[in-house]
């Protein structure tokens, strides 16, 4: 259940079509249905977010008490709204600092979550990293396998990407990986469902 942020104005700016209330409702529903290992992803460095916005988000997550939190540093992808419509966002502040990351780490520690994985990728805000935190026994094994590209992913829906990883190693120790992307346009996806 990935809010990205708990600031509604930011969700609106970045084109996310869920609300903070829907995130909270979804989390509570999942808990009531017996889900006992819920991960929540946040993104640091989103437009117009400052340290107080990060604090607000972490306080709301602390109330929900997830089992696992991943703190991502903003990395603007080629097809992301922030890149495609960059002229709209040029004047907006997008900052991720060590202070933001430290604040998140402090809140995670207060919630009994410890870091269990870290990874970096190209173009991350503030030259920071992504860090996964988890309660004892609640680490997101999926997250680690995905970062190490050791897990096959079967994806459904417009714009999704399936990735097949062969478990037999190549002579050089690497693994064969094949990707298959579904068309992004929902109408085309529906019309071509048998091809996907």
Where are these regions (language model features)?
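Conserved non-cysteine loop/helix-boundary elements of the Radical SAM core domain that shape
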Residues: 1-104
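Anionic group-transfer/hydrolysis microenvironments
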Residues: 4, 43, 119, 157-159
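Short linear sequence motifs
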Residues: 20, 109-112, 182
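Alpha-helix termini
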Residues: 47, 54, 58, 125, ...
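Glycine-rich beta-alpha junction loops
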Residues: 75, 122, 160
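A C-terminal junction/extension of Radical SAM enzymes
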Residues: 79-156
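Radical SAM enzyme core and accessory elements
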Residues: 132-196
